[in-house]
Amino acid sequence: MKYNYSYTPQPHTEAWLTYIRTQEQKSLERDEATMNSDAVPIHPMRFCREIRDFLDEDTTIVGDGGDIVSYGGRVINVSKLGYWLDPGPMGCLGTSTGFAMAAQLARPGQKVLILYGDGAFGLNGMEFESMVRQKLPVVSIIGNDGVWGQIKYPQKAIIGHATAAELTPGIRYDKMVEALGGYGELVEKPEDIRLGWPLRPS
């Protein structure tokens, strides 16, 4: 995310700031290759880059997930305060539909997008019926990798295996949204991500 702020460098912090900026640049260079990868399954950074390149500065983005929201925070630039909404690092999953409906009511006519993990979608997906019934246009994009990513990968790193961190792969969440009165589309290739962006109501 980008924020506007002013800072007056101090002599004792210059070396530290130079080091931090150098490391940040190296990280951005590493990320660039991943953001442009055509690999299948789609890497979350490529997924988020496609979203970033489409959005305008008046789009409210609601993050609801683990890994996918972490990647989104690195890749998607938000230039206005209050246009990135999530419950924070100690918040809970499942808040996005309420946030998104409130954003659409507060800013009628502006784009509202939910960036979902598949686990988070399982906590509030039925609320698409509420958005359809109240005619609140919200676009939702689900990173569907079939795992609780922020549970599985730390468990494997710490204890060597994962417990209760799997979801059923390949669930057709797009069909669920259609059953609730919305529009759904499945996208499996990076080059089709833009084609899978109809900007229709949920």
Question: What are these regions, as identified by a protein language model?
Answer:
Residues 1-18:
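Terminal amphipathic helices with adjacent charged low-complexity linkers/tails
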Residues 1-5, 70-72, 76-202:
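Thiamine diphosphate
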Residues 9, 37-40, 166:
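Alpha-helix initiation/capping motif
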Residues 10, 24, 28-32, 128, ...:
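A general, composition-driven signal for non-globular sequence regions
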Residues 22-103:
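Active-site diphosphate/adenylate-binding microenvironment
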